[in-house]
Amino acid sequence: MIKKLDRDAARQKKHMRIRKRVKGTEERPRLCVFRSLNHIYAQVVNDVTGRTLVAASSLDGEFKAANVSGGNIEGAKKVGELIAKKALEKGIDKVVFDRGGYIYHGRIAALAEAAREAGLQF
């Protein structure tokens, strides 16, 4: 039986392999995602300067006002809409998607699709 620590270590190894190839620039920053059991986080990062340009999570006030759980697909969709809205307000319309070592399924896919529908291109 695979333990939680083993799964997380495997995910982190995958993420390091992905990070070697996926780099955010000033023209196309990186949209990275982190998923925990009860929450989901997304941020747009410029890897050249090492700065976070925009961030959204299931802990934001706008998210909490929607009265949705952060640990399900509906919550991930809401976070995807929030990150896209904030990025478009800052003039960012093209990003590179970094799934963070998670498989493109469930909450990760829901966040990505919602961000695409809200106007982000990747």
Curated annotation (Swiss-Prot):
Source taxon at top rank: Bacteria
GO BP, one annotated term: translation
Entry annotated with the keyword Ribosomal protein: yes
Alphabetical list of InterPro entries matching this protein: Ribosomal_uL18_bac-type, Ribosomal_uL18_bac/euk
Keywords: Ribonucleoprotein, Ribosomal protein, RNA-binding, rRNA-binding
Gene Ontology terms: cellular component: cytosolic large ribosomal subunit
Family, per entry: Belongs to the universal ribosomal protein uL18 family.
Task performed by this protein: This is one of the proteins that bind and probably mediate the attachment of the 5S RNA into the large ribosomal subunit, where it forms part of the central protuberance.
Oligomeric and partner information: Part of the 50S ribosomal subunit; part of the 5S rRNA/L5/L18/L25 subcomplex. Contacts the 5S and 23S rRNAs.
Protein name in UniProt: Large ribosomal subunit protein uL18
Taxonomic placement: Bacteria, Bacillati, Bacillota, Clostridia, Eubacteriales
Name of encoding gene: rplR
